[in-house]
């Protein structure tokens, strides 16, 4: 499930939806570079960074946190074994199966493709937890001919569910 890291602008939206409390256990399934776990770690009691293969970048980025546990395992297996309070699913493989198992208070699925977002929303509806899909479009400035122009980031669907 590893891929390009989640942009900080998108992480801000994810954080606003998951609203973790200091006693929460957070899970970042498909943690990739570890950027999402890095953002959440200071705000939760424990954070799990889960991926089939933990990247060197994630290991380096997360080693400074005492409350972060890196687990090389499938997201479905993690959710069968652990019961986190808030869950972020950043990968696309097996999303419906993970949502079927997931009993977290709040869950977010990030998707680059509308089909994945709709599939996640459909499964969340079946479970009675769907709240909304937020389409995040952001652009960052860059220098151009002595002025500023903007370069768009890829849009991301943030699918939110809550019990």
Swiss-Prot record:
**Record-linked InterPro entries:** CbiT, Cobalamin_biosynth_MTase, Methyltransf_11, SAM-dependent_MTases_sf
Residues bound to S-adenosyl-L-methionine: 6, 30-34, 51, 75
EC number(s): the record gives: 2.1.1.196
Pfam families in alphabetical order:
Methyltransf_11
In which pathway does this enzyme or protein participate? Cofactor biosynthesis; adenosylcobalamin biosynthesis; cob(II)yrinate a,c-diamide from sirohydrochlorin (anaerobic route): step 8/10
According to its UniProt entry, one GO biological process term is: methylation
CDD domains linked: AdoMet_MTases
Provide the catalytic activity annotation.
Co-precorrin-6B + S-adenosyl-L-methionine = Co-precorrin-7 + S-adenosyl-L-homocysteine + CO2
Indicate whether Metal-binding appears among the record's keywords: no
Cystine bridges: which residues?
none
Which protein family is named in the record?
Answer: Belongs to the methyltransferase superfamily. Archaeal-type CbiT family.
- Please identify the protein, giving its name as recorded: Probable cobalt-precorrin-6B C(15)-methyltransferase (decarboxylating)
Species of origin reads Archaeoglobus fulgidus (strain ATCC 49558 / DSM 4304 / JCM 9628 / NBRC 100126 / VC-16)
Q: Which gene encodes it?
A: cbiT
């Amino acid at each position: 499930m590893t891929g390009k890291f989640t942009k900080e602008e998108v992480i801000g939206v994810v954080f606003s939806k998951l609203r973790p409390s200091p006693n929460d256990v957070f899970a970042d399934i498909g943690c990739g570079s570890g950027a999402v776990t890095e953002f959440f770690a200071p705000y939760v009691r424990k954070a799990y960074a889960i991926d089939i293969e933990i990247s060197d970048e994630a290991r380096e980025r997360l080693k400074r946190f005492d409350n972060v546990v890196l687990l090389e395992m499938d997201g479905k297996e993690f959710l069968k074994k652990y019961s986190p309070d808030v869950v972020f699913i950043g990968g696309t493989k097996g999303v419906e199966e993970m949502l079927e198992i997931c009993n977290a208070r709040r869950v977010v699925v990030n998707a680059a493709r509308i089909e994945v977002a709709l599939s996640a929303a459909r499964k969340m509806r079946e479970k009675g937890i769907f709240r909304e899909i937020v389409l995040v479009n952001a652009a960052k400035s860059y220098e151009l001919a002595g002025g500023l122009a903007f370069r768009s980031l890829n849009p991301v669907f943030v699918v939110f569910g809550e019990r």
